[in-house]
Amino acid sequence: MTEYTPKERLYRALRKQPVDRMPAVCFTQTGTVEQMEASGAFWPEAHADAEKMAKLAEAGHTVIGFEAVRVPFDITAEAELFGCGIKAGDLKQQPSVIKHSVKNLEDLDKIKNYSLDTGRIGTILKAVKILSEKYGKELPVIGSMIGPFSLAQHINGDAWFGNLFTGEDIVPALLDFCADFNIAYAKAMVENGADTIAIIDPTASYELIGGEFYEKYALPYQKKIVDAMKELDVATVLHICGNTTNGLAIMDRTGVNAISVDQRVDIKTATGNVENAIIVGNLDPVAVLWNGTPEDVEAASKKVLDAGVGILTVGCGIVSMTPSANLQKMVECAKNYRY
């Protein structure tokens, strides 16, 4: 069989086309302290500096061996753009949302005039361009963003779930706003060189909101993003935390190319629950990759591969203290696998 470039290989694998072997990629957060030390680009500065962000993302390829480059390393830049307060994090901890900006429709109107060129959103787009110009012909460039449901929760805060249950007008209005922003942001990423979009929507977990609420408040808005990317021939990967086994069939209706599942999902069951998307995952980021040994990683990888995973990767974002040797072993296992 033809030997493909990493870019060609992932393009084909995400579209269920024959490939020479499994891609070795990560669709979730890739930054670790060891990569920071190797690259000289450290958190939290790398969250807000395009050159440092690109340099740390590059380390995922040059240090670990991932056959793709991916930015950013957190899911708070979007909320920050819309006036939310952010705790910057540190060398080991990612940024987090600590203050919310929209309580009602009047507040929502105040954040509608935004620019993608400002703040950390602009920084991320610059980092995508830097990476694309250096690696885009050979490697996939993955642009990641928080999904519309989780972004709405970040913006609306603790009131969000109460508003869902009482059917407040702010809910569909904010979800429409977030999905439209996601589409504009994803298109800007593509314009700057991204060829794959990862949608990280943790608060939309089936474990948290159930099938009825997912179908009403998450599915249509995620699907809008996916449909917009399909028009550009850009693959999409949806990651939602928790045991999403019983929700996979609904998630599959978004039309995404791949669904990323965490370590609590049984891969064999998961692959039987979807018709269109491939299942990617789902090594335990804590017990196996952070606290385990390369031998543990190899054993866990074999189990996941034998269960029929579409692409072997991490079950959630990589813990910043994860040893490079463990990630390198995961990459090796993926590269050695033939479908």
Curated annotation (Swiss-Prot):
Pathway: One-carbon metabolism; methanogenesis from methylated amine. It comes from the Archaea. Its EC number is 2.1.1.247. Keywords: Metal-binding, Methanogenesis, Methyltransferase, Transferase, Zinc. Its cofactor is Zn(2+). One of its GO terms (molecular function) is [methyl-Co(III) methylamine-specific corrinoid protein]:coenzyme M methyltransferase activity. It is an enzyme of class 2 (transferase). The keyword Repressor does not apply. One of its GO terms (biological process) is one-carbon metabolic process. The keyword Glycoprotein does not apply. Zn(2+) binds at H239, C241, C316. It catalyses: methyl-Co(III)-[methylamine-specific corrinoid protein] + coenzyme M = Co(I)-[methylamine-specific corrinoid protein] + methyl-coenzyme M + H(+). CDD domains: Mta_CmuA_like. Belongs to the uroporphyrinogen decarboxylase family. MtbA/MtaA subfamily. Methyltransferase involved in methanogenesis from methylamines methanol pathway. Catalyzes the transfer of the methyl group from the methylated corrinoid protein MtmC (MtmC1 or MtmC2) to coenzyme M, forming the substrate for coenzyme-B sulfoethylthiotransferase. PANTHER family: METHYLCOBAMIDE:COM METHYLTRANSFERASE MTBA (PTHR47099:SF1). This is Methylcobamide:CoM methyltransferase MtbA. The lineage of its organism: Archaea, Methanobacteriati, Methanobacteriota, Stenosarchaea group, Methanomicrobia. The gene is mtbA.
